[in-house]
Amino acid sequence: MSEPIENLTVDAELDAVGLFCPEPVMMLHQKVRDLPAGGLLKVIATDPSTRRDIPKFCVFLGHELVAEQAEEGTFLYWIRKKSD
């Protein structure tokens, strides 16, 4: 990543706090679909399985996982939608 997380400008945010698999990834799929190409999405989740599922989602669909961070049971992800 070329710049610090706090300097990233997000285009949308997905709050998946309190949701469990498969809901966070299902919501992520819809939210990414609504983003413009190259848009940056911040995801906030509490389900530990997102640590596995979200990186795989990005690889499988060609999106960039710009950054991820874990803070006291909360998992944060910054995802850049692939260019069309």
Curated annotation (Swiss-Prot):
InterPro entries membership: Sulphur_carrier_TusA (IPR022931), TusA-like (IPR001455), TusA-like_sf (IPR036868)
Subcellular locations according to the entry: Cytoplasm
Gene3D superfamilies per the UniProt record, alphabetical: TusA-like domain
Entry's Gene Ontology BP terms: tRNA wobble position uridine thiolation
Domain of life: Bacteria
Chief location of this protein within or outside the cell: cytoplasm
Gene Ontology molecular functions: sulfur carrier activity
Keywords recorded for this protein, A-Z: Cytoplasm
Pfam family, one: TusA
Active site: C21
GO cellular component assignments: cytoplasm
Biological function: Sulfur carrier protein which probably makes part of a sulfur-relay system.
Entry similarity comment: Belongs to the sulfur carrier protein TusA family.
Protein name: Sulfur carrier protein TusA
Phylogenetic lineage: Bacteria, Pseudomonadati, Pseudomonadota, Gammaproteobacteria, Pseudomonadales
